[in-house]
Amino acid sequence: MTAILERRESTSLWGRFCNWVTSTENRLYIGWFGVLMIPTLLTATSVFIIAFIAAPPVDIDGIREPVSGSLLYGNNIISGAIVPTSAAIGLHFYPIWEASSVDEWLYNGGPYELIVLHFLLGVACYMGREWELSFRLGMRPWIAVAYSAPVAAATAVFLIYPIGQGSFSDGMPLGISGTFNFMIVFQAEHNILMHPFHMLGVAGVFGGSLFSAMHGSLVTSSLIRETTENESANEGYRFGQEEETYNIVAAHGYFGRLIFQYASFNNSRSLHFFLAAWPVVGIWFTALGISTMAFNLNGFNFNQSVVDSQGRVINTWADIINRANLGMEVMHERNAHNFPLDLAAVEAPSTNG
């Protein structure tokens, strides 16, 4: 009788860590991107919760008029927000150690910059983690590509726009009413509703919702019944089954007769590519539009573009929008400007004496 003994190679601590990080057998895949994603998202989430509850007012406009955003300072879930970093800080990197005290850091809105930078790094790593897991499993990389749309949108409003405008105080506040305020001010200053890229984004979001509802309802309505009338049709499905769970021919025929033949897909793969690509491309365009308007390449201006034979202006909807924009703009930062922005931009005369 012969016994064969094999020496088990001892793996270093670093090697075991690498194997654990890249293992697809874990309940939740970590990945190398996850090593950075986990601490950054935990930091952003923790600081957001603490600041939303208890942060003191922030001097957002840099004029010594603090704005309250937390629950303990009089706000509720709807009105509360993480107030953006002060205009006095501008685009400066403003960690806690750059302030003379924690009170000063809070007064100047340091938590906003901390949350935003950690959040953007975290969601970018989440996108990389999606690609990494797809690669490990031998899948195609399109899940990460689709997720790049919301990552691009978040980067546009939280980073690119403040860079273009010269201050993190112009970034989107982290709250419900703060988001709406950002949208209103953005329209007033950049006329985003008249920007073609925003129009493509609206078509992408609403069109994607419509197509998703149509697809889900068609599939649900054309299930291949494996149960009796007294049982739920869902009981006839078994996870991992090889058979089709719905009849695409029936769905194609229904939709083709409802509209016209070529309005429906007869290829499931091209159908699902379309369902993914439509909203993703639309949101890409919106993020690109925000990034261009950040540097004041604004929406179309058709103000007073229609006149009669006597040269008198015939108002169009573009003029109505322009009037609304002016009203919103004069209400924005009303204590920060003594003059309209266009007049305030003129160089002041020098004084001698």
UniProtKB/Swiss-Prot annotation:
Entries under InterPro entries matching the protein: D1/D2 (IPR055266), Photo_II_D1/D2_sf (IPR036854), Photo_RC_L/M (IPR000484), Photo_RC_L/M_CS (IPR055265), PSII_D1 (IPR005867)
Sorted UniProt keywords: Acetylation, Calcium, Chlorophyll, Chloroplast, Chromophore, Electron transport, Herbicide resistance, Iron, Magnesium, Manganese, Membrane, Metal-binding, Oxidoreductase, Phosphoprotein, Photosynthesis, Photosystem II, Plastid, Thylakoid, Transmembrane, Transmembrane helix, Transport
Binding site for chlorophyll a ChlzD1: H118
Residues that coordinate or bind pheophytin a: Y126
Any one Pfam family match given in the protein's UniProt record, by short name: Photo_RC
GO MF annotation: an example: electron transporter, transferring electrons within the cyclic electron transport pathway of photosynthesis activity
Enzyme class: oxidoreductase
Family note: Belongs to the reaction center PufL/M/PsbA/D family.
Name of the protein: Photosystem II protein D1
Organism listed in the record: Nymphaea alba
